[in-house]
Curated annotation (Swiss-Prot):
Part of the ABC transporter complex PstSACB involved in phosphate import. Responsible for energy coupling to the transport system. Its EC number is 7.3.2.1. This is Phosphate import ATP-binding protein PstB. It is found in: Cell membrane.
Length: 329
């Protein structure tokens, strides 16, 4: 990415976070960025211009939104939270309800565990947060999910942007059948970054952030599937954070790993919380106690209890919670 465009893009991203609902501010920003697009070097990649234009389009859509109350922008959204969920219900195949009246607030820069028996709705819930469930046919949901104060189902934030800012690491190891380098670079190019130097710098930083760089720096063109299980999972995390998300969703990220690899992933997760909010589905109560700050207990598609991990495991308020953590449920 050209230096000038990179600066414009960086500045716009920074300003985007501060955008309020006032019409005058939207119009002012639209004018500024239209001018910047007009002044870009003619050789600039069309994809890069499109990135800026898409942000302008978002602002223009906001002007058309007459109702800027809680249906779109939550006026009383607590800045300490990253998500606020109100009355969330979810169905598979139109009539099989798996989530019931979920009301939650998830704090920023904390590691929050979702615990509960298999089939209780944890994985379905976590996929609601970046609308991955919406990629499936025959699903529906209602209620409101506010991400940094914005209703994710109102059109104020498009799905691709949401999934970039709310990254996902899955239970199964999912490296692409590419080289180690291309596993990260591919996503960067897909998001309009084409400058080779910039890509190399981002790849290196992502691998360093996941403590993988020193292990693979001399073999970046090796196929990612030849890595060990722990290395593959760290690569998947590096791939997710290369796009600088606000949130990392993790669905049982260590369930397929041995104890040594699990320890390295847990250490990495604790380090990453300084920059990212992490929401993790886990069946390991020992892991929950070791690495998480907050815990949410699900049962039969409902939230039974939410609190600090220490409180949940030492002073649970609900009998059902106590039965579960003591192994009697």
């Amino acid at each position: 990415m050209k230096k000038g465009l990179k600066t414009i893009w960086h500045n716009f991203i920074q300003k985007r976070e501060k955008v309020k609902q006032y019409r005058a501010l939207y119009e002012k920003q639209i004018k500024q960025y239209q001018q910047k697009v007009a002044k870009l070097d003619p050789t600039t990649k069309a994809e890069e211009i499109a990135n800026l234009q898409s942000e302008i389009d978002v602002l223009q859509r906001l002007i058309k939104i007459k109702n800027t109350k809680d249906d779109v922008v939550k006026q009383d959204f607590d800045k300490k939270n990253v998500f606020e969920i109100e009355n969330l219900n979810f169905w598979y195949n139109k009539d099989k309800q798996v989530l019931f009246d979920i009301n939650l607030k998830i704090k920023r820069n904390k590691i929050t565990a979702l615990i509960g028996k298999s089939g209780c709705g944890k994985s379905t819930f976590i996929r609601c947060l970046n609308k991955l469930n919406d990629l499936n046919e025959n699903v529906r949901w209602n209620g409101k999910i506010f991400f940094l104060g914005k209703n994710i189902n109102s059109g104020i934030i498009n799905d691709l942007t949401l999934r970039t800012r709310v990254g996902m690491v899955f239970q199964q190891l999912t490296p692409f059948n590419f080289s180690i380098f291309e596993n990260i670079a591919y996503g960067l190019r897909a998001h309009g970054i084409h400058n080779k130097q910039a890509i190399h710098e981002i790849v290196e930083q992502a691998l360093k952030s996941t403590a993988l760089w020193d292990e693979v720096k001399d073999n970046l063109h090796r196929n990612a599937n030849t890595l060990s299980g722990g290395q593959q999972q760290r690569l998947c995390i590096a791939r997710a954070i290369a796009l600088q998300p606000d949130v990392l969703l993790m669905d049982e990220p260590t369930s397929a790993l041995d104890s040594i690899a699990t320890n390295s992933i847990e250490l990495l997760i604790q380090q990453l919380k300084e920059k990212y909010t992490i929401i993790i589905v886990t069946h390991s109560m020992a892991q929950t106690i070791r690495i998480t700050d907050e815990t949410i207990f699900f049962a039969n598609g409902r939230v039974v209890e939410q609190g600090t991990t220490k409180q949940i495991f030492t002073r649970p308020k609900q009998k059902e919670t106590n039965r579960y953590i003591s192994g009697r449920n």
